[in-house]
Design a protein with these regions (language model features):
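Conserved N-terminal glycine/acidic-rich loop preference
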Residues: 4-5, 15-18, 46-61
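Translation machinery proteins
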Residues: 39-40, 45-47
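Short, compact, well-ordered microdomains
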Residues: 55-86
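Negatively charged, low-complexity tracts enriched in Asp/Glu with abundant Ser/Thr
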Residues: 1-40
Length: 86
């Protein structure tokens, strides 16, 4: 399941409106149960480039080979969103 530009815009709106990234993740999971959404500490993502920045919040795209996760800059390969708050 790829993440489309519309998905990313919609996720950005949800994340921007939420009181916290955890709340945003819960809202997005309810809205799109097929999409994996993870919340991690911003420090863990310090060497990665976000797909989207929303003030103190960042959204990263991730993909999995079934065993390992990796951050990707290619939405067509992404199967998950990773959210952080600085």
């Amino acid at each position: 399941m790829a993440i489309t530009p519309d998905d990313l815009r919609a996720a950005g709106a949800v994340i921007d409106a939420a009181g916290s990234v955890r709340e945003a993740a819960a809202t997005w999971r309810t809205r799109d149960p097929a999409m994996r959404v993870l919340v991690v500490d911003a420090h863990d993502m310090r060497d990665e480039t976000p797909a989207l920045r929303l003030g103190l919040r960042s959204v990263y795209l991730a993909t999995s080979n079934g065993h390992c996760w990796s951050v990707t800059g290619q939405p067509e390969l992404a199967t998950a969103l990773i959210l952080t708050q600085h």
